[in-house]
Amino acid sequence: MRKAAITRNTNETSIKVAVDLDGSGKYAVSTGVGFLDHMLEQLSRHSLMDLEVDAKGDLHIDAHHTTEDVGIAIGQAVNQALGDRKGICRYGSAYVPMDEALTRVALDLSNRPYLIWKVAFGRDKLGTMDTELFKEWFQAFAQAAGATLHVESLYGDNDHHIVESCFKALARALREAVEIDPRKADAVPSTKGTLGGSL
């Protein structure tokens, strides 16, 4: 089973994360940031990755450190669960609509972290969460997971719908990319023979 657990403690946050890439989309998420919890639940449900997150952070300041560090911890857990990445499909992509909003995500689990983020919001906050923090979460996740990640909002008016379609599209792309290719189950999906992160 491809599982991993991560504990991350800093002066700003204390976070425990567990993932099972071969799960069924079960989740138990508590970050202290209601909207972030909602998005992480969508990530789990639509990727079929079981996800546990218990985070305590300096929310008396703002949600920045908690959001970023949760992204790091989930990314680290996914990276660890992937191991040498042998047999994975590696690539995934998805178009996900939510009412008037449509998002496109393309993902490569290449161990070459990079984020392209083409998402704009009309509001400063969703609930208590600053909308600028969503990019911080995706950046932290991509870096820690070793993922090349392109996220593009094609159109949409409702900011809730836009960001939710971003997380759901990531979920669907991740589900596709982590799948084991039965034709290449014993091979690393790279002509270099490794996805160890070196250029």
Curated annotation (Swiss-Prot):
InterPro entries: IGPD_sf, ImidazoleglycerolP_deHydtase, ImidazoleglycerP_deHydtase_CS, Ribosomal_Su5_D2-typ_SF. Keywords: Amino-acid biosynthesis, Cytoplasm, Histidine biosynthesis, Lyase. This is Imidazoleglycerol-phosphate dehydratase. It holds the Pfam family IGPD. NCBIfam families: PRK00951.1-1, PRK00951.1-5, PRK00951.2-1, PRK00951.2-4. It catalyses: D-erythro-1-(imidazol-4-yl)glycerol 3-phosphate = 3-(imidazol-4-yl)-2-oxopropyl phosphate + H2O. It is an enzyme of class 4 (lyase). One of its GO terms (molecular function) is imidazoleglycerol-phosphate dehydratase activity. It comes from the Bacteria. Its main location: cytoplasm. Belongs to the imidazoleglycerol-phosphate dehydratase family. Its EC number is 4.2.1.19. CDD domains: IGPD. GO terms for cellular component: cytoplasm. Pathway: Amino-acid biosynthesis; L-histidine biosynthesis; L-histidine from 5-phospho-alpha-D-ribose 1-diphosphate: step 6/9. It is found in: Cytoplasm. The keyword Cytoplasm applies.
